[in-house]
Amino acid sequence: MAKYNDKELAETSKFLSFVLRHKPEAIGIVLDREGWADIDKLILCAQKAGKRLTRALLDTVVATSDKKRFSYSSDGTCIRAVQGHSTSQVAIAFIEKTPPQFLYHGTASRFLDEIKKQGLIAGERHYVHLSADEATARKVGARHGSPVILTVKAQEMAKRGIPFWQAENGVWLTSTVAVEFLEW
């Protein structure tokens, strides 16, 4: 595996998140319904857009991402973001799963007033993202400011018929979380 510095890996990961989750049209690629993009086309279009992207750099980002944001198809010709999509091109058919008793959501304290009014909503994404442990939720919340960890009564939600899914990187997904299922 080629050697890349942390800044280069982080910038490439952010770029891939942007085009594979939100705006594939920004560089002229098309994702299929499961979010897959042809790797050769991705590299070519990224390079035309002025990004230094190679297969070796992709391999390193996929292999070293602590959150396992991206995955390759079984034949190695396509790549996708595992979850976090906002583009209407993608509708990954996640398998419904029974959640643990509690899941966690990390957010910034400045968002609490709105959450107390409306609960957790997906916003521009397709799903609300939840973590299986508080440490991961804390990292997520810290990206937006002073982190606050909310406990989600996931099993109680599931017992009321609210579905949950789990992405291949372990992130739990649901459509919304009503205020009644949150502990502050």
UniProtKB/Swiss-Prot annotation:
Signal peptide: none
Keywords, sorted A to Z: NAD, Transferase
Name listed for the protein in its UniProt record: Probable RNA 2'-phosphotransferase
GO molecular function: NAD+ poly-ADP-ribosyltransferase activity; tRNA 2'-phosphotransferase activity
UniProt gene name: kptA
Function: Removes the 2'-phosphate from RNA via an intermediate in which the phosphate is ADP-ribosylated by NAD followed by a presumed transesterification to release the RNA and generate ADP-ribose 1''-2''-cyclic phosphate (APPR>P). May function as an ADP-ribosylase.
Gene Ontology biological process terms from the UniProt entry: tRNA splicing, via endonucleolytic cleavage and ligation
Protein family according to the UniProt entry: Belongs to the KptA/TPT1 family.
Keyword field contains S-adenosyl-L-methionine: no
Top-rank EC class of the record's enzyme: transferase
EC number from the UniProt entry: 2.7.1.-
Organism: Escherichia coli O6:K15:H31 (strain 536 / UPEC)
Keyword tRNA processing: no
Pfam (any one): PTS_2-RNA
